[in-house]
Amino acid sequence: MAEAASGAGDVTLEGERGKRPPPEGEPAAPASGVLDKLFGKRLLQAGRYLVSHKAWMKTVPTEDCDVLMTFPDTTDDHTLLWLLNHIRVGIPELIVQVRHHRHTRAYAFFVTATYESLLRGADELGLRKAVKAEFGGGTRSFSCEEDFIYENVESELRFFTSQERQSIIRFWLQNLRAKQGEALHNVRFLEDQPIIPELAARGIIQQVFPVHEQRILNRLMKSWVQAVCENQPLDDICDYFGVKIAMYFAWLGFYTSAMVYPAVFGSVLYTFTEADQTSRDVSCVVFALFNVIWSTLFLEEWKRRGAELAYKWGTLDSPGEAVEEPRPQFRGIRRISPITRAEEFYYPPWKRLLFQLLVSLPLCLACLICVFILMLGCFQLQELVLSVKGLPRLVRFLPKVMLALLVSVSAEGYKKLAVWLNDMENYRLESTYERHLIIKVVLFQFVNSYLSLFYIGFYLKDMDRLKEMLATLLITRQLLQNVREVLQPHLYRRLGSGELGLRTILELARALLGLLNPLRPDPRRHLEAQADEGGAGSRRCLGGGCGAPEEENEEEEEAAVERRPAGEGGEVPEGPRGGKEEDEEEDDDEDEDEEYEGEEGSLLDCGLRLKKVSFAERGAGRRRPGPSPDGLLEEGSPTMVEKGLEPGVFTLAEEDDEPEGPPGSPGPEPQTVLLRRARGEGRDQGPDGDRDTETGSGDAAGRQKRHNRSSWIDPPEEEHSPQLTQAELESCMKKYEDTFQDYQEMFVQFGYVVLFSSAFPLAALCALVNNLIEIRSDAFKLCTGLQRPFGRRVESIGQWQKVMEAMGVLAIVVNCYLIGQCGQLQRLFPWLSPEAAIVSVVVLEHLALLVKYLIHVAIPDIPGWVAEEMAKLEYQRREAFKRHERQAQQRFQQQQRRRREEEERQRHAEQQARRERDTGGREEARAEAPGPDPVAERGAAKAKGSERPRRPGALLPPGPVLRLKQIIPLQTRPPAPTGCAPPPRSPADTRLPAFLSLRFLKAPERGPSPPRPGKLFAFSAREPSANGAPGGGARAHRSAGDEPAAAEPEPRPEDAGHRP
């Protein structure tokens, strides 16, 4: 029997990927635990101990993973390989690992990136980072060219937060685009269409979400969730969850702080003005005017506070996106865009308008009619109850409570209807989609929440009844809201499917009352007594109804396995529990955990025992990893390279957790296990290598079932550790939708406070208490029960600010009408006629609107210091830009100068090389030719010299050559006596014209020299110059170009006849 059970266990293990959950139509297995009925098995076997946040401490942390991408368990290998190849080719900056989740039987991509790649991604994303003080301070978009100006850029751990890393990776994944004509199965992509959003919209990718960072999460649990009486760590929230979520909690905290004033003032009025009717009328009027002023001040002050936070987080002056991508859910006909000339989806606007007129509008009107009918039915029931004499006061409130319950339930239905209508209207952009969804939901909620109050106040004109109805709606809605957020959304799913009946609700109430009782008995003893009375073979715990057997049953099963005959192997099979010693140690550890954690720890231990049960039958089939002869896991494997995967894509985890067998058992297997044995083909072999015939049939069936679904992409089967990985646990959590639902709840509450609080002054106090709980419950929900959302950068709370401002204007009209029509004004001023009362109400309304407008104008939206800092930062940016432009221009000029110098140097080098080649060629030709004749060379040189054009100075005879400035005065001088040499002149005299020379003006007159026939100027053949050199001062001042002519040899007398 033991062998058969072991074989069956192997078959179940190998076929676990082929398992599917039972259809929803089939009845689920009965469970005795209340929490199991509420939450079910949706969160896998380990989902039952998610109630406690200490479940995080029991999971194996996931390292080297920022973003997790999971796929359904039915995804084929071709899809995984196609997407993996596109990611690695299209986004080489990412590091992708493929892993298989054992419990969910699904594949997942573990995505991360290096620090250098993240820096480039921050530059592409335009991520705003803090700038050092010496470079102007403030924040600006990151640039890799100027990375030195940013704070902490040298530190890899301090520069990027985990939320920023995940945002960069998400930006890359969303910008992975398809080429023209690409397709995956029946999904055909447009050119440049994002691949991953489209696959996620089609259901091929199950989810893409960032992974929690447990160290920071634990710190937030202590400083945020558990610190009830302290301020919220908004900066830490912004760094971890992003600006949008941090802005919501900042608004909620500011709203709660502002709610203190109307709560205190309303409580004082309610306490001291209930003596007589006149006091109540006065308090009603005063509190209505107070609420109008308070709501205006609150909204204006929040604008200033939001601007401060946006400036601090670097989103106040951030530029908007120039081009917004279409929604992945947008569908239409294919056409060529008239703007980009690329293929795109197009949905005609007339179809959307037709759907709005024929479907959306009629459904909205039908919903409003249904709300009105339900309201009238509850009011008729209320009248019937009030007509019966002698009923308790609590029974009189039952119709009001029923109406409040109907309003709360209808709100959920209306929200789903609004989402469906918005989807069917098929908006192209996400911003347009969100704006229309807000309009629909706000209109639905406004009518559904306030219709009964308007009916009582405007039609029945009964302030007492209005006060009771407002109190009932407000308190009931807040209680249901808190219960829903604490007990998880699965309660509603079970309620809708009929699995949550009256008996289960009573058991839940009894269990909650037992938890609140400090003197409650130990639930284990109660369950043991029930198990003994019923004779059940396995015990179930109250904490989760998980069906995990107790330790005694586990020990009995293991003892049965240990009593296996020696001929069947003779050794105790390896498994999670190798012997009784380990069982005792584990029991001692569990007892310590129970003593330390109390009831919460018992629930956690139940989940751990459940995991041990799920792996209890896998002990006989465990094997140690070893190298494969086929090279599947070897580095540089041809199989891996051929298929496009990296050798290290699969990670073997928990290899060192293999427990050793008892003394006498064989040691660890050698590391030469064949691939077939690593895949389970050698499991039915004994320690000596012989095949175990008893277990061969079961293992053969398991191998056959596994072979049918086996895939080469399957990673090697890891050690069967009972611990659950963090990534697998988070993939089972519910996704955090958005802040939309939270803002919607606060919008309804704000309307209750400002619209009708004059009838019930304690409404603000009830809202204050609810908000104090709401902050911590939302924080607890984000930190423990939901997946981590991607961070989004926003400037403010968006459209909700405008919606609440419109609510403030409407509050003035409603309160003034209630004052005029419900009798307060007539009772305070009985001498007023009806016409005068109406005029007084209109005047009061206009005065209130004027006061609201003056407050709006008087208080600027942006604080003065923020405006100054922004102006200073803008000035510094401009100056830095100018400085950058000058530096860039100087660098450009230097580059141009260096380029010209390099070109000039290259040109000179080429000329020099050419000159050397020519000189070398002439020398070679001269060396090859016979000896030259000196007379012939001299004649050739003369002929060449005569042919060469000469400058005018070279045509004159050698001797003292004067320039024009020396010639002009000589023409008017008398001829000098023969044989007298002219006085020497200094070089400075020859640089100035003669008529400007001081020496010339003071020199004595000289006689003209006798002219010589045939000569224009009286130049002697060889007249010594002033400096003793032939040629005079003119030749001394010749340019470099005249030097060759001056160096020419003196012609001989016999050649004088050849001169021109």
Curated annotation (Swiss-Prot):
The modification Omega-N-methylarginine is found at residues 991, 999. The modification N-acetylalanine is found at residue 2. Residues 1-32, 529-605, 619-640, 653-672, 680-723, 884-1060 are annotated as: Disordered. GO terms for cellular component: plasma membrane. Predominant expression seen in epithelial tissues. Residues 2-244, 303-356, 422-437, 767-802, 858-1060 are cytoplasmic. Residues 972-986 have a biased composition (Pro residues). It is a multi-pass membrane protein. It is found in: Cell membrane. Keywords: Acetylation, Cell membrane, Glycoprotein, Membrane, Methylation, Phosphoprotein, Transmembrane, Transmembrane helix. Its main location: membrane. Residues 14-23, 680-694, 899-927, 935-950, 1049-1060 have a biased composition (Basic and acidic residues). The modification Phosphoserine is found at residues 318, 665, 796. It holds the Pfam family Anoctamin. Residues 549-559, 581-602 have a biased composition (Acidic residues). The chain crosses the membrane at residues 245-265, 282-302, 357-377, 401-421, 438-458, 746-766, 803-823, 837-857. Residues 534-547 have a biased composition (Gly residues). Glycans are attached at residue 708. Does not exhibit calcium-activated chloride channel (CaCC) activity. This is Anoctamin-8. It comes from Mus musculus (Mouse). The gene is Ano8.
